Every structure is written in C-alpha cells, then in structure tokens.
Curated annotation (Swiss-Prot):
The gene is olsB. This is L-ornithine N(alpha)-acyltransferase. PANTHER family: GCN5-RELATED N-ACETYLTRANSFERASE, L-ORNITHINE N(ALPHA)-ACYLTRANSFERASE. Keywords: Acyltransferase, Lipid biosynthesis, Lipid metabolism, Transferase. It comes from Brucella abortus (strain 2308). Pathway: Lipid metabolism. Belongs to the acetyltransferase family. OlsB subfamily. GO terms for biological process: lipid metabolic process.
Length: 281
C-alpha cells in the first residue's frame, strides 16, 4: 500500500483532504495527489539545493525535484496558502515528510537508519508506534510563526489519529564541519542527551563527537541563539538528542538525532494545540 492509499482515514468520503488546521489563508493537510507530492518535491529542491547548496545528482538537476524512494511510501504534510491565485498544487508553501512503522517496513527501513541505529528503538520497545519526521522546509517568505504552528498542528493531529508513541528524525546544522557548530553541539550533548532507555547512537562509521567544548565553557544563552530554529522547536516540545552527530556530505549538513516521546511533550504545548489537535481546526 502506498502512502497515498494509506491516507484514507484522513480524507473525506469524496476523496478531498481533511483540513488539519487553518490560520487565515493558510491551511495544513496531507497530500492526496501525485501533483501535490511533486510540488512538495519541487519546494524541497528550491530550499535544499538552490538555497542551501545541497549536491545535485543528474536526475535532480534535470527534474528540479528533490525525490527519493521513500516519497511514494511516506505521507506528506503540506501547508497551502489558499489566497494565492494559482492552481492548488502551486499554493504549497511548506512541507514535512512523515513515515510510520508499517510504511518503513515497506521501504526496508527508516530514512534516518542510514545515519543512526534506529533499530535500537524498535528492538527495545517492539510495540511502540513510531513516526519519523523529515524533509521539513518552508518557502523563505513564509518562515513565520503561523506556518510553523500549522506544521506542528498537522503533525500533532497525525500523531493523535495514528496513536503515535514517539516521534524522531534528523535535524540539521547548515555546514558539514562539526567544529563550526561546537557551541550548539556541545550544548546539546551536555544538556539534552536522551536517557538510556531512549538513547539512539550514530552508526560507528559515521559517528562524530558532539562534546567539543567542556560544559563549563558554554554560554547557554548564546548556544541557544545559535541553534537552528527547527532544533530549538523540538527542544521546546521536550525532545532529547541522540548520541553523536553525523556529517551529511550530500546535503552539506551536520545532523543530530531527535527523539520526542509523546509522553514527554510539554503540557503547555498540548494545551495550546489541544489534546485532540483541535486548536486551529
């Protein structure tokens, strides 16, 4: 079953996507067409390759899309600006890729398993309902609180509907030199490391130490200010950080592993978005 086929619980009886949240002209919902997925891939290409300088393969350069084998299996959370006078698939201004256990089985593993020992999570808690978050990006002119809130609203609604126990995935620092992010990485290592029962370690051949500075040398305020917005957002929710960073040469990033058990999400955020994700519906 493809990602599109697996989404029926979040579609209305007429096949239209159910709106998971709305703020003004912005709406968040799941992709329910190949045109929508391709539009998300085009947005990812513009952000990751044209803006951030990821390395283009031949097919990506020709098609102008960031696409891989996971896209047909995953669900794609999309933010639309319905006020734009263009066809619907061209209204997409933000995206998040979501993959549950059963989808990962069809893909022969989670995307982040290429960098981290995700299998440890599955083996230590075989009954956990896992959700991998990835490929998060937003058009530059829409990088605002409203857009981010709608992406979180959509992810939270998805978690509630699928009874997810833990969210995880890679988050990135721009640049493939860990030492350039010594302050941020060291802060995460000393203050945000996962507890033993949730810990996930970078694969041995990709492991990069994060404790590049002693704890007493870290200015916490400056470290947090230097942190990528996505990482800070995860931390505010209650996320923990896995053991070791990983260099992603293709995307030109230094990645860290995010682990966010639902039980650890800050109560104020659950109150804000609603226990049943009905804040912006």
């Amino acid at each position: 079953m493809s990602g599109l086929e697996a989404q029926q619980a979040l579609f209305a009886s007429n096949g239209d996507a159910i709106i998971l949240g709305r703020i003004g002209s912005l709406e968040v919902r799941l992709a329910n067409s190949r045109a929508a997925i391709q539009a998300a891939q085009e947005l990812r290409f513009r952000v990751f390759f044209e803006e951030m300088g990821a390395r283009k393969e031949t097919i990506e350069a020709v098609e102008q899309r960031d696409a891989d084998r996971f896209d047909t299996i995953c669900d794609h959370l999309l933010v639309y600006d319905t006020a734009l006078p263009v066809p619907e698939h061209q209204q997409i201004v933000g995206t998040y890729r979501l993959m549950r256990n059963e989808q990962a089985e069809k893909a022969l593993g989670f995307y982040s398993a290429d960098e981290y020992d995700v299998q440890r999570l599955k083996l230590s808690r075989p009954n956990l309902r896992l959700l991998e978050l990835g490929r998060s990006c937003v058009k530059p002119e829409y990088r605002s609180k409203r857009t981010v809130e709608l992406l979180w609203q959509g992810a939270w609604a998805y978690c509630r509907r699928h009874s997810i126990d833990v969210m995880f995935g890679c988050a990135s620092f721009h640049g493939a030199v860990p030492a350039a992010h010594a302050l941020g990485l060291s802060f995460l290592h000393h203050n945000c490391r996962a507890t033993d029962d949730w810990d996930v370690r970078a694969l041995p051949h990709r492991y990069q130490a994060m404790d590049l500075m002693p704890k007493e040398a870290i200015n916490n305020k400056v470290a947090l200010f230097s942190m990528p917005p996505l990482v800070k957002g995860y931390l505010r929710l209650g996320a923990m950080i896995g053991d070791g960073a990983v260099i992603d040469e293709a995307f030109g990033t230094t990645d860290v592993f995010i682990i966010l058990p639902i039980e650890r999400i800050s109560s104020r955020y659950i109150s804000y978005y609603g226990a049943e994700a009905n804040r912006f519906v």
